[in-house]
Amino acid sequence: MKLLSVLALSATATSVLGASIPVDARAEKFLIELAPGETRWVTEEEKWELKRKGQDFFDITDEEVGFTAAVAQPAIAYPTSIRHANAVNAMIATLSKENMQRDLTKLSSFQTAYYKVDFGKQSATWLQEQVQAAINTAGANRYGAKVASFRHNFAQHSIIATIPGRSPEVVVVGAHQDSINQRSPMTGRAPGADDNGSGSVTILEALRGVLRDQTILQGKAANTIEFHWYAGEEAGLLGSQAIFANYKQTGKKVKGMLNQDMTGYIKGMVDKGLKVSFGIITDNVNANLTKFVRMVITKYCSIPTIDTRCGYACSDHASANRNGYPSAMVAESPIDLLDPHLHTDSDNISYLDFDHMIEHAKLIVGFVTELAK
């Protein structure tokens, strides 16, 4: 997630395993894109130095030489009125802060969810098990709902849960699951409670809510629904890039993608005397889809919005956008008031507000239902 001025408040991180990054890993070079058409070969340490300075990027090392720029997006007509209020409100009533607190307590207990190490693989495996349990508990597996790993050339895998609809066109909700200790990426403690354990468990709870609707559960919604948990976001949007590039190559149609990156920290707004609000990202997103998201928030959520800019390649919605798919992102706050503990060993659950996370879950349920049903 984008750092910007939050970096100035970051706590000192601690390395607990005592090992250093191997010399050959430091010497390895990666091709990154910092802005459209602006590329650079860097070492891994140079990647983290850019991140520490608040500079985000796509890691495009695995793309073919001569990669293409962002693909033009097709014009998609989004609903201009609310159509499923009764169904959405019934699902919202089932959302549980206790579920999210339980899930996030476990997810942030892993030493780290860094994408290159075994802990990151373990956290992804545990998370996928929770997704499978949600599908099975709802009985959605009997109607074709499933969860699958999306493998990469590093330890952590991405996760895709699919609820079939009458059309193969997909409505996507995504969140990255990896964490990082920027002082010591390979070995440092990185609980990642807010960045992005909060987003991961928020969309998991929203999945549980969506599966309460029998029309959706039984595969009778107009469109297919997918929930994504991306690996390797902190290293340059690796997991989401791979998934949306695959979708582009295979011709998959995506009606819209909503990204949830950090959903739980409100203290920055409170300390500034601001009303607790969503941060609506306005750059590198689809304007029409974002307008639809605003309508959903107005109808189903109890907090207002503040417009904010996130920058190029700041989170996984940018991967959808770059591959020609309309995307939107809603953050926990304006970008300059994000959780100052992100990317450190202090990104703990104690700083988060689960009522705020429930508001994000309401948004997701409304977004998915109004767009897919």
Curated annotation (Swiss-Prot):
Alphabetically ordered keywords of this record: Aminopeptidase, Disulfide bond, Glycoprotein, Hydrolase, Metal-binding, Protease, Secreted, Signal, Virulence, Zinc
Its EC number(s): 3.4.11.-
Swiss-Prot/TrEMBL GO biological process terms: proteolysis
Regulation: Activity is inhibited by EDTA, o-phenanthroline, bestatin and amastatin.
Requisite cofactors: Zn(2+)
Glycan attachment positions: N196, N288, N348
SUPFAM superfamilies: Zn-dependent exopeptidases
InterPro entries tied to this protein: M28_fam, Peptidase_M28
Gene3D superfamilies listed in its UniProt record: Zn peptidases
Temperature impact on function: Optimum temperatures are ranging from 40 to 50 degrees Celsius.
Protein location: Secreted
Binding site for Zn(2+) 1: H176, D195, D261
Binding-site positions, Zn(2+) 2: D195, E234, H343
Keyword Disulfide bond: yes
Expression triggers: Expression is strongly increased during growth on protein-rich medium. Expressed at even higher levels when keratin is present in the protein-rich medium.
PANTHER family for the chain: AMINOPEPTIDASE YDR415C-RELATED (PTHR12147:SF56), METALLOPEPTIDASE M28 FAMILY MEMBER (PTHR12147)
Summary of subunit composition and partner proteins: Monomer.
Similarity remark: Belongs to the peptidase M28 family. M28E subfamily.
Protein name, per record: Leucine aminopeptidase 1
Organism, scientific name: Trichophyton rubrum
